[in-house]
UniProtKB/Swiss-Prot annotation:
Record: residues binding ATP: 215-222
PANTHER family to which the protein is assigned, alphabetical: REPLICATIVE DNA HELICASE, REPLICATIVE DNA HELICASE DNAB
Family that this chain belongs to: Belongs to the helicase family. DnaB subfamily.
Pfam short name (any one): DnaB_C
GO biological process, one term: DNA replication, synthesis of primer
Residue ranges occupied by any DOD-type homing endonuclease domain in the UniProt entry: 502-651
Protein EC: 5.6.2.3, 3.1.-.-
Name of the molecule in the record: Replicative DNA helicase DnaB
Gene it is expressed from: dnaB
Top-level taxon in the UniProt lineage: Bacteria
UniProt cross-references to NCBIfam families, sorted A to Z: DnaB, intein_Cterm, intein_Nterm, PRK07773.1
Length: 879
């Protein structure tokens, strides 16, 4: 029946601290005196009882009291019976014994304190044992162990239970009591900040909330938060902790003095005060010295250190803290390579701090420079995110099928899967998107890679380099970016081989315009016959195809068998329309979305027949012949689609613009070169038609005797200094020994100037024993050079949030996501007179509530006095 806790550690068999007689006297008093439960319910928790039966009886009394019912013997017996607990506590005899042994409830308050004391001693013993075990966990970093140990001891001092499952009825009772008190004006919903309109909108700062106050420099972020700290400390008499990572405590106190004494800070800094200024200064010093404001100006402080300081302050003051202010977020240390994820981890830790101490935590945050580039410089929620955004036409690769959807069409959706890169394994994995959203109109730049991949993004959007995530405005020409080496395909077949083959021919050389005969044009009779039979296989007797020789061409007309009327369409036109590719001119053509989600065998079939139209497979002559396969089209979208379909087969093709000066529309060539990619093309795509088959055979025979020379699928040379050299030092390997072990002639440091092939990277990784280099050599990524970054104007931009992996594939490039904001309340500051000297809002500051998890958003206006860096209330707006 005793409390189920582990109390080993001192090697004795002593019982844990407890007082059974006091527990029985308390319960007997509750059963005898209807007022007794009200005297102890606020100080005595259920878990304090050592005997489990006593916990059940006390819980029954608490439930009855909360419902306004008496706690006499009959009522408690009835409640225990209804909840099937009577037998477990020892039956009616147990309750009768408690009543018989109790004379009165006169000393119940003292007894409750005694039982709580024994409970806290037991908790202290439990915490001590757990701390002993923590001391042996040497794999954990010492600051983490110390923080966890401190947290366990701190938990013992708290009056409320620190953890465990709580029945919803208990929480509902507490909520109802709070609502009732607020309705009667007894209690405020949150901690008033002193600004009336802001309090009206937020209902005060709620305990356990993380609040972000953001703005560009000179908007008054620090002044605003110091005003909040001053107001809460002065009016609520609650301790306020200020952690200043940017300014010293002397500078902060000087600001508080200037604001409180109404003396310009310049006079305080110089010490040149007039006779009339000494009295308000003395009065301000007297008032501030009585306020419970505590400042820590340790630079680069961690959340763990803050938590420790805040716990200690709360224990010393003996009351809950009123506010914690952190100035500012970006200066905090998080211990990670990826700054975006590091800041996300910091904000989650701050949210945990707010919940643990039940105190509002305000973190100041610097907004990105993107605000300055806009015409309207009012900040938006998206400015707070560390990551940037993409234009609406950016194609996001979904999982598992590999459909590519414009990001603008995903806005408002969540819970769908995309392909993302696991940075630990450098393999593609499925990840779930939690949010897709627009972030407004912003300046964008077009980034183009050597392969011809293009993406338009804001300057602060991050891309993955060999050195980690880098903003677009930090990238340079010839720097390598991370791209997927292949895109996984779906195994669910929804189209037939005949359908995808016919589709390839019609997209390539078909005329499918409205009010025009559906026809296919080719120079080769075997291709004409192929289309003839494919059409019959797909549509059967519904069409009557015919081949018509015309000069040096063959036309295949795909006519409907039935006479066409207003309500009866050609079956071929109807089918193409259902796929979204009917009525397109050559420069408008693209691959239907449905094809992207087909198995690779069908994708190969489509490409094989498409290549027979405007594709080329040949050996380019000269002193040194070179094999090449390319597809030519005047449609940029079709070229991108073909490049993407090849990527699904593991073929990394390049996309090149081929200008047609004076000859018509520009052409786009999707080129396949290099032995590995051409081998894959021959194996997986192949050819159809006698002409293409002969050319393919020539290339096959050439490649059989060709030595592979890596110049595209490489690992950037930066890894020599980043990974290889440190690994060599750890295994005490010289440069000459490295050359010898990887089987290459000694060339000194010149070796480090060359990119690595995957084969060489595998050898080097084995020699220097580098798991990081081995992961790169076996990865799913392709490192592609940047060839240009150009400004593209302003446009509406969008982004995704991908919890966990924090990235996704857009336009066949690995890009970072926007991390979800953990804050419960986001406040942004804006002063129009800072940007516009002739504004009618001179002297006004806009406090923009951009996010409010439990209430409305909107804008509150305050007076801002720059002379004393002080925010003041306007007349009450009656919000």
């Amino acid at each position: 029946m005793a409390e189920e806790l582990s109390f080993q550690g001192d090697g004795s068999n002593r019982l844990p601290p407890q007082n059974i007689e006091a527990e029985e006297a308390i319960l007997g008093g509750i059963l005898l005196d209807p007022e007794a439960i009200g005297r102890v319910s606020e100080v005595l928790i259920t878990e304090a009882f050592y005997i489990s039966a006593h916990r059940d009886i006390y819980q029954a009394a608490l439930r009855l009291h909360a419902q306004g019912k008496p706690t006499d013997l009959l009522s408690v017996t009835s409640w225990l019976t209804d909840n099937e607990l009577l037998t477990r506590i020892g039956g009616r005899n147990k309750l009768a014994t408690l009543v018989d042994r109790t004379v009165s409830a006169v000393n119940i308050d003292a007894l409750a304190g005694l039982v709580m004391e024994k409970y806290l001693r037991r908790q202290l013993i439990k915490a001590g044992n757990e701390i002993v075990h923590l001391g042996y966990e040497t794999e954990k970093e010492l600051p983490i162990v110390l923080d966890q140990a401190e947290q366990k001891v701190f938990g013992v001092t708290q009056e409320r239970p620190q953890s465990g499952l709580v029945h919803i009825a208990d929480t509902l009772i507490n909520n109802f009591q709070e609502i009732e008190e607020r309705n009667q004006g007894i209690a405020l919903p949150g901690i008033p900040c002193g600004f009336y309109d802001l309090d009206a909108m937020t209902s005060g700062f709620q305990r356990s909330d993380l609040i972000i106050v953001a703005g560009r420099p000179s908007m008054g972020k620090t002044a605003f938060c110091l005003n909040l700290a001053n107001n809460i400390a002065a009016t609520m008499k609650l301790p306020v902790a200020v952690f200043s990572l940017e300014m010293s405590k002397e500078q902060l106190v000087q600001r508080l003095l200037a604001s409180e004494a109404q003396i310009e800070s310049g006079y305080l800094r110089s010490g040149r005060l007039s006779q009339t200024q000494w009295e308000p200064l003395s009065r301000a010093i007297s008032m501030l010295s009585e306020m419970p404001i505590f400042i820590d100006d340790t630079p680069n402080i961690t959340v763990t250190q803050m938590r420790s300081q805040a716990r200690r302050l709360q224990a010393e003051q003996g009351v809950e803290l009123g506010l914690i202010v952190i100035d500012y977020l970006q200066l905090m240390e998080g211990g990670g390579d990826n700054r975006v994820q590091e800041l996300s981890k910091i904000t989650r830790s701050l949210k945990g701090l707010a919940r643990e101490l039940s105190v509002p935590v305000i973190a100041l945050s610097q907004l990105s420079r993107g605000v300055e580039a806009r015409t309207n410089k009012r900040p938006m929620l998206s400015d707070l995110r560390e990551s940037g955004c993409l234009t609406g036409d950016s194609l996001v690769t979904l999982a598992p099928g590999g459909l590519q959807i414009p990001i603008r069409e995903l806005v408002g959706k969540s819970g769908f899967a995309i392909w993302a890169l696991n940075q630990a394994t450098l393999k593609l994995e499925k990840a779930i998107v939690s949010n897709a959203f627009s972030t407004g109109v912003k300046p964008v730049f077009t980034l183009t890679t050597r392969k011809g991949c293009k993406i338009r993004a804001t300057a602060n959007h991050k891309f993955l380099t060999i050195h980690g995530w880098r903003r677009l405005d930090e990238l340079s020409i010839r720097q390598h970016l991370c791209l997927p080496r292949h895109i996984p395909s779906f195994d669910k077949q929804t189209m037939t081989y005949a359908e995808v083959a016919l589709l390839g021919h019609l997209i390539g050389d078909g005329c499918t315009l409205p009010r025009h005969a559906i026809q296919y044009t080719t120079r080769e009779i075997d291709l004409a016959e192929n289309v003839f039979f494919l059409a019959k296989e797909v549509f059967g007797d519904a069409i009557t195809p015919r081949i018509s020789p015309e000069r040096s061409w063959y036309q295949v007309y795909l006519s409907a068998t039935q006479r066409l009327t207003r309500n009866l369409r050609n079956p071929v036109a109807k089918w193409l329309d259902s796929l979204g590719v009917f009525g397109l001119r050559s420069y408008e053509k693209f691959v239907p979305q449905e094809l992207f989600s087909q198995p690779i065998e069908l994708i190969s079939c489509f490409l094989r027949h498409l290549w027979s139209t405007d594709g080329s497979i040949k050996l380019v002559g000269g002193k040194k012949p070179r094999p090449i396969a390319y597809y030519a089209t005047s449609s940029y979208r079709l070229a991108v689609d073909v490049q993407t379909l090849l990527l699904k087969l593991g073929i990394n093709a390049t996309l090149k613009l081929v200008p047609q000066v004076g000859k018509g529309r520009n052409q786009y060539h999707v080129k396949i070169t290099g032995k590995p990619d051409l081998d894959l093309f021959i194996k997986k795509v192949g050819a159809v038609g006698e002409y293409k088959l002969n050319s393919l055979q020539q290339i096959f025979e050439y490649l059989e005797n060709c030595i592979h020379n890596t110049n595209r699928d490489i690992i950037p040379k930066d890894v020599w200094k980043k990974i290889v050299v440190p690994a060599m030092q750890s295994v005490q390997l010289t440069t000459r020994e490295l050359h010898s072990n990887i089987g290459t002639s000694y060339c000194g440091l010149a070796l480090y100037k060359a990119n690595l092939s995957r084969e060489r990277a595998l050898k080097v990784a084995e020699v220097v024993q580098s798991s990081e280099l081995l992961t790169l050599a076996k990865s799913d990524v392709y490192w592609d050079e940047i060839v240009s970054i150009e400004y593209s104007g302003e446009e509406e931009v969008f982004d995704l949030t991908v919890p966990g992996l924090h990235n996704f594939i857009a336009n066949n490039i690995v890009v970072h996501n926007s991390i979800e904001q953990d804050a419960d309340l986001v406040i942004m500051l804006y002063r129009d007179d800072y940007y516009n000297s002739d504004t009618p809002d001179r002297g006004l500051a806009e406090v923009i509530v951009a996010k409010h998890r439990n209430g409305p958003t909107g804008t509150v206006k305050l007076l801002f006095d720059p002379q004393f860096t002080k925010f003041k209330n306007l007349a009450r707006s009656g919000y």
